[in-house]
Amino acid sequence: NKQAAKFYYYQLHTERGKQGYDYLNGRGLSDDTIRKFGLGYSDKYGSLLYRFLKEKGYDDEILRQSGLFLADEVHGMQDKFWNRVIYPIMDANSRVIGFGGRVMGDGKPKYLNSPETKIFDKSRNLYGLHLARSSRRKNLIICEGYMDVISMHQAGFNNAVASLGTALTSLQAGLMKRYTDEVLVIYDSDEAGVKAALRAIPMLKGVGLTTRVVNLRPYKDPDEFIQHEGCEAFEKRLEEAENSVLYEIRMKERDFDLADPQGKSDFLHEAVRRLVAIEDEIERNSYLEAVAGKYGIAVEVLRKQVGQMALSGAGRTERVKPRNTAANKKEKEGGVEKAQKLMLTWMTSYPALIGKLEKYITPEDFTTPLYRQIAEMIVLQYHEGGVNPAKLLNQFVDSEEQKEV
């Protein structure tokens, strides 16, 4: 991997790599940033890296295990990455363990990652952590993509990291906990980014991390925000990051009509469920006061509701449905979950179906967070060369989740 990274970096600075260099330069990256992250390029010819490494003395079996090549019966070993800007992925100790590639032009898939190997496990690593771990800033920033991390580091926010093409895992959250007690979540401001943030928050809080969410609106991502507003404005957004519990409650507003008395009542019941989940009484009381003040309800009324729901256990088992939406019966929910589970089984057993299904179904269509996460992993593995059920199972450390998977 180290030799491959050197090769890609060299290629970026040749005439063949001009397209890749122009792309990175067009995204505002300096030569120093390109060097710091070891960015490179793999050109349109699909065997240059293979020939380079063969000349270095590597045999085919080692190259096959590296994840850098695809074996073709007709053409032999072909480079996995071609016509792409290359992002070397390093572990916390700065060892190159894999690569990400962004296609030049309109080819598919737009982004391609190394498959999992003996040294590369996406669920246990974070892009940019080898640099962020040395930051003097008190927290870490978790964002979505390579360019988000790179642009933030270039702008001076050198505490940014990103998950590697998958939803944030508990192992990645635990990895961040080694270096900080607080994480700022900066995902894209679109609907997909909001859903990703809501899935990440429990992972982060589950390992004891204080978690806040940064508002990027009206811009989509950190790179776009910094380009338009500058570093000082971005720093201000970091300082104003919203407490994750209040963010979760605010996001629930979208499902209710707060101008309607019944809608507001249903929303507040849903907010109460979130407050019930807070075990520490002092912490819960602080949130009670904040929610009561924001939504104009007496603290004692809210406290009484939380107490009643906590005693009944309803906060853990029931969901208030938004007004004017169809209420699904348990039998119907069970049928939907069974159908989705069957779909995941088909996708795992017959990966060739995935290419056809993608036109009609995306991971976001799965209604339960666990099934949605599994679907994302299956599709990612498919685009990286093959679906491996054993590796899917290993992504889940929770025994109940493993049993369900």
Regions found by a protein language model. Name each.
Residues 1-4, 8, 24, 38, ...:
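Short alpha-helical scaffolding segments that buttress acidic/His motifs in well-ordered protein cores
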